[in-house]
């Protein structure tokens, strides 16, 4: 067992990019993805805010998803870019705690928000006459507020524990951000009790919401199958397939990473999987929701036409 480090409290993030041409290529690719995510999510938020036809619970939830994704990727990538450009892979003890807190908060909030969006589609398709009551503005705000509060409390508990455990002399985190499970490998104490709480937390905030989402869309698909209108059936299938694509792309790598015991995990595999839910998903969400949505594309076309008409 290693000795405690009494002189330095900084961590070292080993990162994702090797110092080679391949590393430069991966860095450039991720930086471009980051820019696309910023532009896409900001555009989605502004579009929903500006177009009065999109002022509905469904699009309000979608704007919150874009807001979460915008902050989510901004919590991770700027530090990666700085480390690669300046060759400084260190992160302060406090900085690591802050990054971990925001990552966990945004990750859980997105999962809960996706569950709310699934419930919204379930009510809209299965109980259309009850929709204004079940998904009122007040209910919508409560779901969003609840998602943020629950995720913040959960994140605070995990981050405080991670910052309070004693760490060994080696402070090199084999990851590209301060991921709590990766930090636990550096601990100079037995963390099996905490690892059990991580498994429990992952089950509560990953497996249970995904089960709820699957049940909601199962009911939706059954209701859609019974529809007489071909146009309505096509629109409902399009909406559901869009949401299921987002959910699967987000939950699958996340659950596979956090629900597995440490003995079955590898740092390289964890880093690759983390790219999906921290970098790719925030970039893909606005693209998937806009390209498969006639209302969003129509609103985007109107905004572009207004901009060009003003310039003319």
UniProtKB/Swiss-Prot annotation:
All ranges on the Cytoplasmic side of the membrane: 49-56, 120-138, 219-235, 292-312
- Superkingdom per UniProt: Eukaryota
Q: Which GO terms describe its biological process?
A: detection of chemical stimulus involved in sensory perception of smell
Where does the UniProt annotation locate this protein? Cell membrane
Write down the Pfam families for this protein, in alphabetical order: 7tm_4
Question: Which residues span the membrane?
Answer: 25-48, 57-78, 100-119, 139-157, 195-218, 236-258, 272-291
Query: How does it sit in the bilayer?
Result: Multi-pass membrane protein
Supply the CDD domains for this chain: 7tmA_OR2T-like
InterPro entries referenced in this protein's UniProt entry, alphabetically:
GPCR_Rhodpsn, GPCR_Rhodpsn_7TM, Olfact_rcpt
Name used for this protein in its record: Olfactory receptor 2L2
Organism listed in the record:
Homo sapiens (Human)
């Amino acid at each position: 067992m290693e000795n405690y480090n009494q002189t330095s409290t900084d961590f070292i993030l080993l990162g994702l990019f090797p110092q080679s041409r391949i590393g430069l290529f991966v860095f450039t690719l991720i930086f471009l993805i980051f820019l696309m995510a910023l532009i896409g999510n900001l555009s989605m938020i502004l579009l929903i805010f500006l177009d009065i036809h999109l002022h509905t619970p469904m699009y309000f939830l979608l704007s919150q998803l874009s807001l979460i994704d915008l902050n989510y990727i901004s919590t991770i990538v700027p530090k990666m870019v700085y480390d690669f450009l300046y060759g400084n892979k260190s992160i302060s003890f406090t900085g690591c705690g802050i990054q971990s807190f925001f990552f966990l908060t945004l990750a859980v909030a997105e999962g809960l928000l996706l569950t709310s969006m699934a419930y919204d589609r379930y009510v809209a398709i299965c109980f259309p006459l009850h929709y204004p009551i079940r998904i009122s503005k007040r209910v919508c705000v409560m779901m969003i507020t609840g998602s943020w509060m629950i995720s913040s409390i959960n994140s605070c508990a995990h981050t405080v524990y991670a910052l309070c455990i004693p760490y060994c002399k080696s402070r090199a985190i084999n990851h590209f951000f301060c991921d709590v499970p990766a930090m636990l490998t550096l601990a100079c104490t037995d963390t099996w009790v905490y690892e059990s709480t991580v498994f429990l937390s992952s089950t509560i905030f990953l497996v249970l919401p995904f089960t709820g989402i699957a049940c909601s869309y199962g009911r939706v698909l059954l209701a859609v199958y019974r529809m007489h209108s071909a146009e309505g059936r096509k629109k409902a299938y399009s909406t559901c397939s869009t949401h299921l694509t987002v959910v699967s792309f987000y939950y699958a790598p996340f659950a596979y990473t956090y629900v597995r015991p440490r003995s079955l995990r590898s740092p390289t595999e964890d880093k690759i999987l983390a790219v999906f839910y921290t970098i790719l998903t925030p970039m893909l969400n606005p693209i998937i929701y806009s390209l498969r949505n006639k209302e969003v594309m129509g609103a985007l076309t109107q905004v572009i036409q207004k901009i060009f008409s003003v310039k003319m």
